[in-house]
Swiss-Prot record:
Cystine bridges: none
Residues that, per the record, bind substrate: 8-11, 66, 123, 127, 131, 193-195
Cofactor: binding comment: Binds 1 FMN per subunit.
Identification of the protein by name: Pyridoxine/pyridoxamine 5'-phosphate oxidase
One Pfam family named in its UniProt record: PNPOx_N
Amino acid sequence: MTDLTSLRLSYTRAELRREDLNPDPLRQFQGWFEEAQQADLTEPYALQLATADAQGRPSVRTVLLRGADERGLTFYTNYESHKGHDLAANPQAEVLFYWAELERQVRAFGTVSRVPEAESNDYFHKRPRESQLAAHASTPQSAPVENRAALEAKFAALHEQFPEGTTIPRPAFWGGYRVQVQEWEFWQGRPNRMHDRFRYARDGDGWRLDRLMP
C-alpha cells in the first residue's frame, strides 16, 4: 500500500471571510449549494448522515438531500433501516457535505423527525417507477439476503404485482426525515492547513456566528 503520510494537497482555490457570509446560515448553504451545482459536480446533493443508537454506537452512510428550507434538511429512506432504528432511539444527527473540487465542506447538526405522510407520498410518486418498486423490494433494509438472485426474484415478483399503468403505493415503512438544524459549520480549505471555519449556533430566534480555529 502507498505510504499515505506523503499524500496531501494544498488548498488554494478561495478564502472565506466573515463579511462574505450571509447572516442566515440557510441562505449561506443555499448559495454554496447553487455554486456546487453550477460547478457540475457529481451528485452535489449527496450527504453523509451520521447517527448513533441508544448505546451511543455511531454509524454513517450516504443519502441524498431532497429539500433544504426553513423547516430543515430533508432526506428519504426506509424507516426499518439501521438509520431508522437509530433515529427512533436517538432522534438527532449530523450531516456532512464535502465538495472536493470547491475545497469546501458544510456540517449541520440537529434534531430529526419524520416528515408528514402526505409529503412522503408526494415525493414517493415523483420517483422513477423502478425506484418505487425497489423501495418495496429492499425490506427489511440492512437484513441479510441469501444472494443477488433472491433479491432480483423479489423485484421481478413486484413487477408482476404492480404491472405498468398501476399505481404503486408508498410502503408504510418508507418515508422522509427532516433535520431541524441547530448548528452549521462552513469550511473553506486554505494553504498550509490554515483553513477558514465559521460556525453558526442557534441563539434564541437568531444565530451566533463565530470563526473557529482551523
